Amino acid sequence: SEVRVVNFTPEIANWSPAAFVERMISPLQPEHVLVGQNFRFGRHAVGTPQALSEIGCGRFEVHAMDLVAISGVTVSSTRAREVVAAGDVAEAAELLGRPFEVGGVVVMGDQRGRELGFPTANLVLPEGRAVPADGVYAGWLEPGSGPDAGRRLPSAISVGTNPTFDGVERRVETYVIDRDDLELYGVDVKVTFAERLRGQIKFDGIEPLISQMTDDVDAARQILA
């Protein structure tokens, strides 16, 4: 099998339905094309599954698949992005058929987590990347290399700007539970979200923050056990 990723550009958006078929689909020489019942293509989204079949002129067979609904809500990428943005990673997992995850290379942070007793692996994600709402989550970190490569390590994950320290850059900071020995700078990692624990809070000082972080880690440990 082969997967081809095509960047959706203004030029492609301006193609007519016929141009879309001739330039995007025909070169692949498919025998069957599977689309959703609500599939639309071509300029102003005027192309439909029926139009796709007509333009194909018998060169391939078009199958319009039934839409999937969960609790009466149609499963779609739009809906998945909405629940991720709201921090509902449990519903996101139900819609996606797998837990929501992000990935990237661990970068040097402010070292505050280490000073507080909770060293974190920090990811700065590109703008536009889907990220759960600011808050704290239970989940896993999986290193792509090193002694723990491929292992899912139970973690407490913070998403946000560190308002207690007047931070402005939005980050994903992951504390691997009971593993203060990890050296992850420069390592490509995958962070998987299991359950939301709470929203982001601005604390009045270090002690309340440490107390809450301790509670968060305990809660994450229990959820992931």
What do these predicted regions represent?
Residues 8, 67, 159:
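Active-site donor-binding loop signature of nucleotide-sugar glycosyltransferases
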Residues 11-120, 200, 204-213, 217:
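Classical nucleotidyltransferase
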